[in-house]
Regions:
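N-terminal, intrinsically disordered, low-complexity segments
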Residues: 1-47
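A structural signal for conserved, well-ordered secondary-structure elements
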Residues: 19, 23, 52, 79
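Membrane-interfacial hairpin junctions
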Residues: 104-114
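Cytosol/matrix-facing juxtamembrane amphipathic
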Residues: 22, 35-39, 43-51, 119, ...
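Alpha-helical membrane-inserting segments
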Residues: 94-102, 130-137
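Short, charged cytosolic
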Residues: 42-69
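Transmembrane alpha-helical segments and their cytosolic interface motifs
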Residues: 74-101
Length: 175
């Protein structure tokens, strides 16, 4: 489907994909540096947000290193095991196969209950089959490790209610 790939590689979708790759790479670098705790992120065309307890300077240094390493060709950093893409792919596969297992059960409750173990088994099979698919979809669709022309603009810390810390990592494309 070359037209889909062409769409993904231009303008707004491409900027989101590149920032998504940098977000993942930053999380990998922070993990390598032993930053403990739960961190998460979300990307958009102007950068990404990091949720969790990390010092602003540490995050900045991690993002700088991540950008450098992606630019040097470490494209594997763009794929992250905890990405929501993996969850979405697994959920769709599990739900889709479980739904197929329940097809044709309209009517009696006893018929539905009899089919329930099959639906559960099909859901588990779907989830397991989808595990290698999530990272592949990250690599091909939701991230782009080509960071040429990208620069970090700033990292801003926001302390929100209940002691939650979020950071905005802003980027800019120069090409």
């Amino acid at each position: 489907m070359p037209e889909i790939q062409e769409f993904l590689n231009q303008g707004l979708p491409n900027r989101v994909r590149i920032n998504h790759a940098l977000e993942h790479a930053t999380l990998h670098v922070l993990q390598e540096k032993g930053i403990a705790g739960r961190l998460g992120g979300i990307s958009d065309a102007g950068g990404f947000w990091i949720y969790g307890d990390v010092a602003t300077e540490t995050l900045l240094l991690g993002a700088q290193e991540a950008l450098k390493r992606l630019a040097e060709g470490e494209s594997a950093l763009a794929v992250h095991p905890n990405c929501g893409t993996n969850l979405a792919v697994g959920s769709l596969a599990a739900g889709g196969l479980a739904w197929m297992g329940m097809r044709g059960t309209k009517g009696k409750m006893s018929r539905r209950l009899a089919r329930l173990p099959i639906a559960i088994l099909m859901g588990i099979i779907g989830y397991q089959l989808a595990k290698p698919l999530g990272p592949k979809i990250q690599e091909q669709v939701t991230t782009n490790a080509d960071v040429s022309g990208m620069e970090l603009v700033q990292v801003l810390r926001h302390d929100v209610a209940s002691g939650i810390t979020i950071h905005r990592v802003s980027t800019r494309m120069t090409r």
